[in-house]
Every structure is written in structure tokens, then in C-alpha cells.
Amino acid sequence: MCSSDLEAYNYTRSGVPLIQPFYYNYMWVYDDVLYRNQYYFGSQLLVCPILDKMDTVMNRTLHRFFIPDGIWYDLITGKKFPGNKKYVSFFKEEDYPVFAHAGSIIPLSNRSDYNNTGIPTDLEIQIFPGVSNTYTLYEDDGVTALYKEGYFLKTSIDYNYLRNNYTVIIRSIEGKSGIVPDRRNYKMVFRNTKQADRFTA
């Protein structure tokens, strides 16, 4: 599970669409067939869909995409992409151009049962370097309307970045005692980051 279910809560409260066309912020893209299908997924991800056919000889698709201002990272490979630039790259069938901006905090569930909408006990937190950020993780049972009665969880995650030093603070889970997991395991993954000389937890 990616963070789509968790992101939806934030956008329901604010009224801002979870998926926004890229041309909302870059109007010139609307008239450019190469980039007009790009869109933002939540506040942290940019998706650049591949719509062209794959070259059957190379087993690759040549794809052109535009990265907006700032520093962005390929969500799959972690490769760094400076912004405000046009790019051309080959993609394999299993690849997909999704980019996370610097400072993104992406929560993922490690469970293999994708049909299970319950609150996970194991979470992987992927962090992309470069900018300090704060993310609030929202969770409910994913099935009932009990969240209206306050049966949901919130976890604040703070990422403080200062050159080669960075700190991550995962604050205590807020929520009614009946749904707070007895134990939660976090796996921290720092993308495009050199191996740390020292780690303190």
C-alpha cells in the first residue's frame, strides 16, 4: 500500500483535489502534447504517464517529461533530477516515471495482503533529502464510518535537514485507545543518501 489512502484524508478536509493536473501550475503545458498529461498525486509526488508504444526491438519506450522547480527524485530508483528542465529518457515496461520532491516523507505498508484495509503494525517511511518537512499520517479502519466518531489515528513525522546532518522525529500516535496498535515497527529508508557515519535512535 502506498500513501494514497492516507493522503485522501488531508485533501478531503482541505477541499483540494488529491490529483491535480500539472498545467494548474504550468499553464504553458496545456498546449504542449508532450507534457500536458502530467499530474500531481498529493502534495509530494509528480506522475509523468507514458502513453507511447514500446519499441519492441529495444524493449524500451522513449519518453519526454518536464520536472518543475526544485529538486526531485525518481521514486523507484532514487535518481536525482534538478528542476525546471525537460528530460528525455528510456523506460522499461516495468518502470514508471513517478517523482518525489526533495523533503518528501512517503509512508508505505510492508504487508503483502493488499486487500487488507486495516491499520498496519509495520510501516516503511521513505524520506527524500534536501528540504526539511513535516508530514501527518492519518489512518482509520478503511471500511466503516467510525472515523466520524473519532476512531482514527494521527502520527506526525518531522524531518529536519541541515546539510549532512538530519533528524527524524516520529511523534506518539494520537487516537482512541481501542484502535492504537499495541506495537508499531518502523523501517526508515533514506533515498539518495550516503551511508551514515553515526545513527542514534
Language-model regions, residue ranges each:
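Catalytic core of carbohydrate-active enzymes
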Residues: 4-197
